[in-house]
């Protein structure tokens, strides 16, 4: 039985997060899991999409959620649900539970296919963002399995963080922060890194090829 080298912990000022329970080496796989819920909504379409364009996708997401067993629904609803004055403004037909689900999905989803499908994961969706990450993630399209791998050494007790927008290019730090704040509904407090450690890791590990060799 493999014991994960990470655990969910309370993080001051962030709520929950993932912390190393032992020292982690660069390139080490720390987590692999399947999603609780998959939808065709991304953070951007959830908040800024036209009502007619996103209404069907929202209904499908709610239906998929309703088809989960109660234990899975409870895990989904336990994820962070940010308060937002514009939450679900394009979907007044939704009840409070559905609006909460939409906020959870917008804030916690992880991309599976490039701008096609996103998933909520029991553990990985609690990993916090950093513009200077020490890990990266990648979901495999064929089975939606997600792998999280370190891109530098991580000390015991240190938080494992990823860059939610590692593949996006932003001309300025302000544009990057605006996108994060608008889509993920939290204030990014990190500065633009001078060296993208995870981009280096992707090159070293053959464009995530090692994710599927464990």
PLM region spans:
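Conserved AWS/pre-SET-to-SET junction and N-terminal core of the SET lysine methyltransferase domain
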Residues: 1-51, 125-151
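Generic secondary-structure boundary/loop-capping signal
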Residues: 3-5, 15-16, 117-118, 124, ...
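Glycine-centered secondary-structure boundary/capping sites
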Residues: 5, 41, 69, 179-186
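Compositionally biased, low-complexity repeat tracts
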Residues: 9-13, 23, 91, 115, ...
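Intrinsic disorder
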Residues: 14, 18, 24, 114-117, ...
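Catalytic cores of histone-lysine modification enzymes
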Residues: 32, 36-137
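C-terminal SET catalytic tail plus cysteine-rich post-SET Zn-binding segment of SAM-dependent SET-domain
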Residues: 125, 129-214
